């Protein structure tokens, strides 16, 4: 759910494997990332922000929303993906009221390809650092 609307997220092979590993470790609860205080509530933005700070990222370096901004910028700049596909992946609502009323496309096939290529690129970046 995002903004009280269902949001389907295509997963890369890498993310599916990580989620399976998390499932194996953390049990079989309803939430993948539960709050440390309650198994019925998801982890909060503050919890994610605290994790970034523990990794020594300063306020001016990274925030939780920064991951979405970084993905949007890089995916748009590379020129391989249509703007509508990127916006759908980020669950951004169309600002044009008429288009928003009529276009309910989810672009799932294109988003699946985009997310797999994004994950592959991240793997390449990590490998090049080593």
Model-derived regions, located:
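Catalytic-site neighborhood detector that most strongly recognizes the C-terminal catalytic loop/helix
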Residues: 1-4, 16, 80, 90-125
């Amino acid at each position: 759910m995002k903004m009280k609307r269902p949001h389907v997220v295509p997963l890369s092979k890498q993310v599916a494997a990580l989620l399976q590993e998390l499932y194996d470790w953390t049990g079989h609860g309803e939430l993948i990332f539960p709050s440390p205080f309650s198994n019925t509530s998801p982890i909060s933005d503050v919890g994610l922000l605290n994790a970034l700070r523990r990794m020594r990222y300063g306020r001016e370096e990274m925030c939780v929303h920064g991951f979405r901004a970084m993905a949007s910028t890089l995916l748009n700049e590379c020129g391989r993906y249509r703007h509508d596909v990127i916006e759908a992946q980020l669950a951004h609502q169309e600002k044009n009221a008429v288009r928003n009323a009529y276009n309910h496309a989810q672009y799932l096939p294109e988003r699946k390809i985009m997310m797999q290529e994004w994950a592959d690129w991240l793997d390449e970046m990590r490998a090049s650092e080593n």
